[in-house]
């Protein structure tokens, strides 16, 4: 597993990201989710996905301007790219909802691009063989 923490100062937001997770990472992931005050249904889904080593799955939970992103192990780079961008989209939508940002406007797209750029140094290992 790879782990990354970063801030988004413009939105006073903190992100905790877990990459390439397996059952061995369950305690760290559950602690992050519980620290954020996640619901029982989200916690159950996360526990099932991670403890059963479900591949090509992800989860994003946000509360109080904090987000936990969990990216499970992928079967190939295409599936990782799908899960990675999918969960980035959820995080960006959570930020947009908190701040009343137009979901059809440029600002949301800049949030998505910014998240992708900050996460790329960690994600690149799973996106291509050359990184």
Positions of predicted regions on the chain:
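Short helix/strand-bridging catalytic loops that position acidic/His residues to coordinate divalent metals
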Residues: 94-100
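Active-site scaffold of zinc-dependent metalloenzymes
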Residues: 31-78, 91
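Alpha-helical hydrophobic/aromatic positions enriched in membrane-embedded helices and signal peptides
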Residues: 78-82, 98
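Post-HExxH zinc-binding segment in Zn-dependent metallohydrolases
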Residues: 102-131
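Generic detector of well-ordered alpha-helical segments enriched in charged/polar residues
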Residues: 27-30, 44, 117-124
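Structural motif
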Residues: 74-75, 100-104
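N-terminal low-structure segments adjacent to metalloprotease catalytic domains
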Residues: 1-31, 67-68, 98, 129-131
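Active-site recognition of the HExxH zinc-binding catalytic motif
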Residues: 82-94
